[in-house]
């Protein structure tokens, strides 16, 4: 019986050591990933800013990523140009309103 306990303790020690090595490797990979994400986050376009040249570069809002919303602008000369800005689509606004209302009620 004593031999079985020693073998089980040895196996538990080996498994915990190998899993801690794996966790350390994962933490290093996550750190590199977070640093890369931070760099791309700095390049993101904030809400209400122009996104005409980068339509997929809008930031995240509270719950959803902002969408690049475009409109056609006609100048006094009659020239049409497309202007885009990062904003919250109406259905996302409705969802955020419902969630905010639910948080106030059930808080």
UniProtKB/Swiss-Prot annotation:
Main location: secreted
Keywords: Disulfide bond, Secreted, Signal, Toxin
MF GO annotations: toxin activity
Cellular compartments per GO CC: extracellular region
UniProt keyword Disulfide bond, yes or no: yes
Top-level taxon in the UniProt lineage: Eukaryota
Pro-sequence residue ranges: 21-41
InterPro entries: Spider_toxin_CSTX_knottin
Tissue expression as described in the entry: Expressed by the venom gland.
Family of this protein: Belongs to the neurotoxin 19 (CSTX) family. 04 (U1-Lctx) subfamily.
Protein name per Swiss-Prot or TrEMBL: U1-lycotoxin-Ls1g
Lineage of origin: Eukaryota, Metazoa, Ecdysozoa, Arthropoda, Chelicerata
């Amino acid at each position: 019986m004593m031999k079985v306990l020693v073998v089980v303790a040895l196996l538990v020690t080996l498994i915990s050591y190998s899993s801690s090595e794996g966790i350390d490797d994962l933490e290093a990979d996550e750190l590199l990933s977070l640093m890369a994400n931070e760099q791309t986050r700095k390049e993101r376009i904030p809400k209400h800013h122009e996104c005409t040249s980068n339509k997929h570069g809008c930031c995240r809002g509270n719950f959803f990523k902002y969408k690049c919303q475009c409109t056609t602008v006609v100048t006094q000369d009659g020239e049409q140009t497309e202007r885009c800005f990062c904003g919250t689509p109406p259905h996302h606004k409705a969802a955020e309103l419902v969630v905010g209302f639910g948080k106030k009620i059930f808080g």
